[in-house]
Amino acid sequence: MDIVGGQNLRQMWDDLAGVYGDKTALIFESCEGIVRQFSYASLNEEINRTANLFYSLGIRKGDRVALHLDNCPEFIFCWFGLAKIGAIMVPINARLLGEESAWILQNSQVSLLVTSVQFYPMYREIRQDNSTPLNHICLIGEQLPADDGVSHFSQLQARQSATLCYTPALSTDDTAEILFTSGTTSRPKGVVITHYNLRFAGYYSAWQIALRDDDVYMTVMPAFHIDCQCTAAMPAFSAGSTFVLLEKYSARAFWDQVRKYQATVTECIPMMIRTLMVQPAAPTDRQHHLREVMFYLNLSEQEKDDFTERFGVRLLTSYGMTETIVGIIGDRPGDKRRWPSIGRVGFSYEAEIRDDQNRPLPAGEIGEICIKGIPGKTIFKEYYMQPEATARALEPEGWLHTGDSGYQDEDGYFYFVDRRCNMIKRGGENVSCVELENIISAHPKIQDIVVVGIKDAIRDEAIKAFIVLNEGETLSEAEFFSFCENNMAKFKVPSFMEIRTDLPRNCSGKIIKKNLK
């Protein structure tokens, strides 16, 4: 079933501007509370001006341009401006340091970068090292340097026409983006995403949450992440909704922002749900218009119940990864939700649980979650310049090996167990880190928890828990281990625990376990 119908991203924005005109498309709020707002027509003009800016800097179809930006309207301008001229966006995680960023520039052969003044010192050093093809930087911000090879984004953009001046032939099969995975266990891989992928993501994710043009979708997810792009921005724009993009997440400000913009849909990762729950209860907790809160894994049943009871919201689960583009397994609009299931497979996909010999498993048995889609359309096209890695993950028939463990029940509901690489081998037993984290997170004194395996000469691996306590709480080792012994099998009880003030996380809120081993 082809729901895209041959429409590329240039056509999408021209059509949206014509259909919705003065309707609000994008609202952005900075950390300082400064709000910028754009209609569909004016946003399309900003995108066109940005496309012309890139053309004036020598960018043509097929060229790659890197973005290293926190959430801002300019990210949206650049993303779709590049797509309109057939160029390719390479977003860089805004939390990466110099060596990691230089590696992405080198491996994607990027010569032009758009970034903000706060990141410029790092990229000035990268240019001086001559270790990458980077030769020009377009800067966003005030008090900009007058260095060679540096241009001012706002000044250049303001001089451009609102009418597109370069319109090469585009196909939905053309690459629109190379999105490098977070690389928490190894060097990141460049996930190649096409125009079709992004258009499909818009329609699919809008269907998943029954999005309409009178909805307001608010997110704090980073724009350089697949979630913000394909689960929030693309569906919001595709449905003609209003997309609210916040610069950063603040637990104290979140509900005020939900009410301020009358958001009807938002999304939360477990860290957000936990930090929202430790905020003081208020009479306004249920005074909002939210009808759906999308969330992603690693939430205990008690946490889910407490959150929905306090704030009067529905949680909609969705499972996916960068390579799947969207949440290919999840709750369906109007469907019964079967906690702790991650839902059922969405339209246009197939899903199976397979064993180590790549054979399908019956209901109830744990194996690898495998997804069948169409490369370059409903799942990613390939890993950029890595054919061997592509072949390992993606079978010729379109079956994608996720590397995640799970099972399905007799009714076709799927259940996530853990990342296969996130299992601890302890004395012959496989122990799921997620299972232990869900159990331990129910302790009333614990705000956050992560479990890792550490080397053990006798039992392969020992289990260590890193915990963050709620403000003002104390927890002894005796109390912690007693709680574990009363709530899990003996072989699953951690051998060590360590109290931290915080846990290392990447841009999407995922804990970076390699930094704890």
UniProtKB/Swiss-Prot annotation:
- Give the source's domain of life in one word: Bacteria
A GO BP term here is:
carnitine metabolic process
For this protein, the Enzyme Commission number is 6.2.1.48
Any GO molecular function? medium-chain fatty acid-CoA ligase activity
Q: Which reaction does it catalyse?
A: 4-(trimethylamino)butanoate + ATP + CoA = 4-(trimethylamino)butanoyl-CoA + AMP + diphosphate; crotonobetaine + ATP + CoA = crotonobetainyl-CoA + AMP + diphosphate; (R)-carnitine + ATP + CoA = (R)-carnitinyl-CoA + AMP + diphosphate
| Role, per record | Catalyzes the transfer of CoA to carnitine, generating the initial carnitinyl-CoA needed for the CaiB reaction cycle. Also has activity toward crotonobetaine and gamma-butyrobetaine.
Protein family:
Belongs to the ATP-dependent AMP-binding enzyme family.
Q: What is this protein called?
A: Crotonobetaine/carnitine--CoA ligase
Please name the gene that encodes this protein: caiC
